[in-house]
């Protein structure tokens, strides 16, 4: 494969994210306007984001594991890139799921909360690089077991945790303004 072709292929998942982002917010707004609670819109969005990604990455893992390197064809590459693009595209739903939760909880402190959670995510991301390399070495170079399936596993677990929490909206700023909550 030439460098120009691989460059084009590497941008496809991100283009899918941009395309889906144009659909996500209006769809979430229509769901809420149609009577779905904001909490349920957030949960649906996050479920689409994480479980969609988990399904796509599991399928990529299956294709990668069932295709020896010498048997990779153009169809194999197209299949993997399609699955990755769909998974990345579904990841755009995080913009009306998890990323909005901070604003729902406290508009006043949303930027601090988002910064804190993003910092923790960056630490986890840094550690994941180490663990991917470690798993890659102990699995004999198996990308499915060292990268795709662990990510899919954590996406499913994260979805379950997100769904289990009672997320009745609480406006902490309003409670603080009423004097029922002391400022730190």
Where are these regions (language model features)?
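A membrane-interface helix-boundary motif in multi-pass transporters
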Residues: 4, 38-44, 134-153
